[in-house]
Amino acid sequence: MNIWHDIAPERITAKSFEAFIEIPKGCKAKYELDKDTGLLKLDRVLYTSTVYPANYGFIPRTFADDGDPLDVLVLCGESIYPQTLVHCYPIGVIKMIDGGSLDEKIIAIPFGDPTYHSYYDIQELPKHVFEEMMHFFEVYKSLEHKTTTVKEICHRDEAMDIINKCIDAYEGIFTSGKGKKRR
């Protein structure tokens, strides 16, 4: 089984989706999906003293501009174990430049999380939560002599547009009309 591909399409929509967690909140290890096997592999350990400020993973059945599944940060009161599916809704998106290329990261919240369930747009987040995420993405690769820049923060509607775009890209590349459409 490869979670990127082997999940029912109806479970992945712009308003409600399963996020696959690769990295728990508070971790310095950068795990990522091995696209061939569907397993997690250790990509690297972060060089800086920063840790992931939120649970980090991807949205299955999506294909982003960087050639990977669409990234997602899942804000939750708890660290979530890697390889866990989390039913989420989007509240915004961080658009960054990473290595000269656009890299979009959806910000999402699990349905029913008692800490974050009252937030529906990124602008509603407490200032510190928001600033901690921005700081992380501005410095997490600095000691590797790589540059990342937060370009723009967008609201829920833009996040849903990006998710739809990445679902459509996935369907165009991987299903070629053979699979069930999500709409």
For the regions a language model picked out, list residue spans one by one.
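Hydrophobic N-terminal alpha-helices or hydrophobic patches in metabolic proteins across all domains
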Residues: 1-183
